[in-house]
Amino acid sequence: MAGSSPLNHHLWSSPSRTVEEILAEDRNSEARHRYLLELARKEHERVREEAARIYREQLAREERERLLAERRKEEERIRLEQQIAAENARLNALKATRIEIPPLLPDPVPAPSTVNGKPTLPAAVATEAKRCPSEPSLVNGIASNGVVEAPAAASIKTLEPAKPAASAFKAAGSATTAAPVAPIASVQPSTNGVVSAVASTPKTAPPAPTETPPDRYVEIHRNLKGLRKYMAEQAKTNLKLKQRMGDMRREIRKSVGQLTTGGMAANKDKQQKIKSILTEALSNQVESALVDPNNFVVEPRKPVEGATNNDPLLPSIFVYLINIFAKAAISQFINEAGARPETADPVGICVAAILSEPDFLWRGASLIDILIAKFRIVCPVLFGYRGSEKTEQGRQRLGWWKESGQWISEQQHMDRMTGLGAGFAAISLRKFALSKKQNPYPPRFYWMAMAKIVNTPPAEISNTQCVVLKAMVQNYEAKFIEFYGSAAIAALRTALIDFPARAPHKSAAVNSLEVLAQMLKRDTGLDLG
């Protein structure tokens, strides 16, 4: 090996030992082996110590990263808590702020607005308002006695609402006497489609009321809450009532929730189910106590010759289930018709069909006031109430709902108003010309609700009113025109053209009315411009 080439010597040499050392004579000696083992042991110790050092450094780095991450989390938590505390402080400051709103001065009598020299709908209905002071319209807490009536030749009687007694559900309530009849104007369409007013002014006008009467629909709603508590008290001692009342309530809610847009035939079995439940309730098989229906209607009623139910009292379970039926209908309008307004129509058909049943009338008229009282609470703009959407009082007046003590979002509010506006139209624009039944809520109430909205002063127009008005018109313009002809066209022109034009702020809700007018022109050829 001594004569090997330098290349081979370089390739086979060890970093720590030379070839001569490897091939030395004592390479297999015990001392040589001990020496090599000691070198290997020292190398092993060095590698182990180096690995342990690296491992300790890695653990230290990981611990440092963990501590940094914990610190960042705590800093983020503190930052968020500081933001929440600041927001709560600002919110509390806003809640504590109260702005004193001075009372409004009486509005001046506006001059009749004209289009091409001809009076428009607001001028005509304003003439009616002077002759119909029966239902005061509140504006920001101020009572206004001007109320717009539907175009009809007949007069509407107004009665002082009955005051609920402490024992309203245990004894018959006392009826109040009727007030003098207030004649109203008769609105007739002219040949060119413009509304004109023909007034029937009495020789001696009744004196104006000195104070605003209480809101009867609010009283009815309060009485219905009392009835619900009264039924719960009865159920504690009447086991038959307790067992059946819950089943009947659930069946009515279920049937109303299953109403579809497939037509009357598709919903016939649901209507029949509701009718059979109410018929059973009217027969009072569960032996519920009797109540005075005058506590749940706007005007006290006297016996009517030939009426099916002329008794002064009705079974409380029947009135209670009418209330459940009305509540289920309102829930459908809010939860379903808000996103799909067309779903309000089958519910409106069912409401009109059930409440117009001759067996369910009391002293010649339906109990639809129970349903309308709920409309008054959840959608006050239909009854002439208005207010600012930016104030607590204004939102309350507009029917802006609260959940868990907090106002719902604007989108939720507008969806509710859309469903309720469509539901109101679905109930009030039902055709009974070919039916032997009595229409529980004639179209004149639709006209009145529309007039109360479009007669709003420009400064008080709200997005809520625009959303409700659009929902009332969309999908129901044909029915409206079918009832009132050219007068309805003039009313639609006022609602979709003139009313949004007077709004001081052109919001999306205001513009949607003008867009609806354009859609009607495109889809039906109805030109309101």
Curated annotation (Swiss-Prot):
For this protein, the record's Gene3D superfamilies field holds:
GLE1-like (1.25.40.510)
- Localization: Nucleus, Nuclear pore complex; Nucleus membrane
Coiled-coil residues are: 36-101
Q: Record's InterPro entries?
A: GLE1 (IPR012476), GLE1-like_sf (IPR038506)
Q: Name one Pfam family in it.
A: GLE1
Give the range the annotation lists for the signal sequence: none
Its membrane topology is listed as: Peripheral membrane protein
**UniProtKB keywords:** Coiled coil, Membrane, mRNA transport, Nuclear pore complex, Nucleus, Protein transport, Translocation, Transport
The GO annotation for biological process reads: poly(A)+ mRNA export from nucleus; protein transport
Q: How does it assemble?
A: Component of the nuclear pore complex (NPC). NPC constitutes the exclusive means of nucleocytoplasmic transport. NPCs allow the passive diffusion of ions and small molecules and the active, nuclear transport receptor-mediated bidirectional transport of macromolecules such as proteins, RNAs, ribonucleoparticles (RNPs), and ribosomal subunits across the nuclear envelope. Due to its 8-fold rotational symmetry, all subunits are present with 8 copies or multiples thereof.
Q: What's the protein called, per UniProt?
A: mRNA export factor GLE1
Q: Which organism is it from?
A: Chaetomium thermophilum (strain DSM 1495 / CBS 144.50 / IMI 039719)
Per UniProt, what is the name of the gene that codes for the protein in this document?
GLE1
